[in-house]
Amino acid sequence: MDISIFREYDIRGIYPTTLDEKSAFSIGVELGKIMRECDKSVFVGHDARVHGRFLFEALSAGLQSSGLKVYDLGLIPTPVAYFAAFNGINGIQCPNSIMITGSHNPKEYNGFKITLNQNPFYGKDIQALKDTLLNAKHEIKPLKETPEKVNALEAYQRYLIKDFKHLKNLKYKIALDFGNGVGALGLEPILKALNIDFSSLYSDPDGDFPNHHPDPSEAKNLKDLEKHMQENAILIGFAFDGDADRIAMLSSHHIYAGDELAILFAKRLHAQGITPFVIGEVKCSQVMYNTINTFGKTLMYKTGHSNLKIKLKETNAHFAAEMSGHIFFKERYFGYDDALYACLRALELLLEQSPSDLENTIKNLPYSYTTPEEKIAVSEEEKFEIIHNLQKALKNPPSHFPTIKEIISIDGVRVVFEHGFGLIRASNTTPYLVSRFEGKDETTALEYKRALLNLLEKL
């Protein structure tokens, strides 16, 4: 078995090169042994990738061979698999789910996002599973029985239609780009039931992603949506990744970063008389933390959807946000990343404000210049050692180095300077260091960038 498929947050590989039916069956066998300790059943769904159903059958056969009953959720967005584990479906209560998805990765990728007893199965859990599988031998077997089909999609939609009934007849038309992922399957029926006017691009699930890559964190993938909004005079738009757990929001003159969405959501909670408690990640802007801290409370934590779900549960914060568009609501919801739910929460902003009001809220924040996220190629073996050496070097920085106010080491190195910060962290999923810099203006941000990268080069 190719050990490269065992990542920090999930299991992910290239079909059929590093992840195939044989490995899916073996993973099912050993994962089933772990899952049956808390429940004898599991919900399993898949996204639109062309190999999803092949992996579903092999994984399910492995799970069955370990004594688990498999419930077949079919073609669904990832949040629906989470919803099944947290809420139950049609009287079936089961805290385990597996979503077969390649998320926002290229079409040849696929993998497993695992929920065990309503918690993400990640990090040490995945590494322990890998160690077990390296010493195990399994002969692939067919399904013992056809998994029972369960309509989780309709149950999910009923839940959200009820929770967002106050959005009925929203006065704004919205534009949506689903990138040929599975998001439209979940969201469009909800919008129709609420009589919200919308116009969709690429709503048909197609695992070949013929129009553009389904990653809304890349500006180039938003071009079609921007053009569609301009041509049709639509003031607000949303884009989703392939499995609908990440969102991007656009208005006529602005693309909202994840930390800007966090500010808007926190301000609405505050306006409702709630003192918001918000968790951000190390890549979020200092402006976000400073702004929310004027009327609420923030906590900075590690990047990664599994990390933030666990921290949200621990702290009972209202919500958490990542720059990449993962938004996790605990207030009124279950605390997992759901881009379709986040879209509906964003539409609530329009009950009291116009799209231009939202733009003005962001424009009126203290100005800062932030560099794009950049990747530095390093070997998988060296990346964490490099970060460790950088942390040591910063304890005694060069004399010409900008004044350091604080060093935050929860995830890589975030160096807080007088007028901004510099971040260098090891990616948990790829052989790269990831960097990001912020300053009171472009000159300051680039000064911080030069200083940190020069120090990095000397290590």
Residue ranges of each PLM-predicted region?
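Phosphate-binding and adjacent anionic-ligand microenvironments
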Residues: 274-436, 442-459
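N-terminal small/polar loop signature for handling phosphorylated ligands or for N-terminal nucleophile
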Residues: 41-109, 190-250
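Gly/Ser/Thr-enriched, mixed-charge loops and adjacent short helices
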Residues: 110-230
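Proline/glycine-rich low-complexity loops and linkers
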Residues: 78, 130-158, 162-164, 251-323, ...
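Gly/Ser/Thr-rich active-site loops/lids in small-molecule metabolic enzymes
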Residues: 122, 200-202, 254-274, 338-348
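Short glycine-rich phosphate-binding loop at a beta-alpha junction
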Residues: 39-47, 71, 173-175, 276-282
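An N-terminal, well-structured beta->alpha segment
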Residues: 1-61, 65-66, 91, 149-172
